Amino acid sequence: MSVLDTGIDISHPAFTGVDIVRKNFTTESDDDEHGHGTHCAGTIFGRDVAGIRIGVAPGISKVLIGKVLGSGGGGSDQIVQAIQWAVNEGANVISMSLGIDFPGYVKELETDGFPTELATSMALEGYRANVLLFERLASFIAAQNAFIQAALLIAAAGNESQRDVDPKFEIAVSPPAVADGVLSVAAVGKTPQGFTVASFSNVGARVSGPGVGINSAKLGGGLTLMSGTSMATPHVAGVAALWAQKLSVTGQLNGQLLADRLVGTAATTGMKAGFDPGDIGAGVVQAPQA
């Protein structure tokens, strides 16, 4: 298992007994200074905290933590380097709760003085370049799966939609999740009428996971609630780890088969009536039966 994010608080009780291998791809300290990565890691493999279960796959004994996001975000080069490192180190699941905010990038360029048309064109060119970059990388990893341990890339769909403002205000999945070969993840939340897509969750993801009000490890100790497709992604990564363990017993483990299991067993049971399949993909991922 590998988590590429803001790092991890290795002193948190949720990670007691876990063999954590860290590599820093930023210019900042090795430690998590934000809490985002710590929270995501807790959802994947965190041990119980004060009697509360937070980890989907708490039996994971070794993880690779790549710090690719700092105070100013992160770049594609660092993410690519981290993915290559994780693959070379034998990760079979790589969880990435990160992405490119296309509308936000356009606004940033406009703030820098670029006309709207030029800012949009520049952002689109960057978007396309990133999609192609991650598709080439995913294709390379898929080709390697026949020779080395499998690796499945899982990434957050993004949080730019605003269905709470307008039900039609839906933004498409952002890079790297939109790239072919990457399993994109949408977020769902619980309502009295059943589960529903989170208002912020981008549209067009392949699968979904819980992503609203998620309780997990807090930077410095304890637990805290967070929401986002960033929180849904580690749920899917944790379930992927459980499937990887099951498939490895029969010697069938490879990235494509792992993705097929996650998509093929995903379910829409419990979803609020009238849900749009485009919002949640195949449905919420399901752990394998014992």
Per-range role (PLM):
Residues T43-I44, G66-L69, Q84, G211-I280:
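Hydrolase catalytic cores
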Residues M1-V21, E28-D77, Q84, E89-N92, ...:
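Subtilisin-like serine protease catalytic core
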Residues T26, L64, L152-I154, S184-V185, ...:
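Structural detector of well-ordered beta-strand residues that form the stable sheet scaffold
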Residues M1-V3, K23-D32, E135-S139, A143, ...:
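N-terminal domain-start motif of subtilase-like serine proteases
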Residues M1-G7, P13, D164-V249:
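Extracellular S/T/G-rich loop segment that most often corresponds to the catalytic His/Ser-adjacent loop
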Residues V68-P175, L219-T233, G274-D276:
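Substrate-binding/access-modulating region of protease and related hydrolase catalytic domains
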Residues D19-T27, A217-G222:
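Glycine/charged-rich beta-loop-alpha catalytic/anionic-binding loops adjacent to active sites
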Residues G99, G158, A187-K190, A266:
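Flexible loop residues that form catalytic
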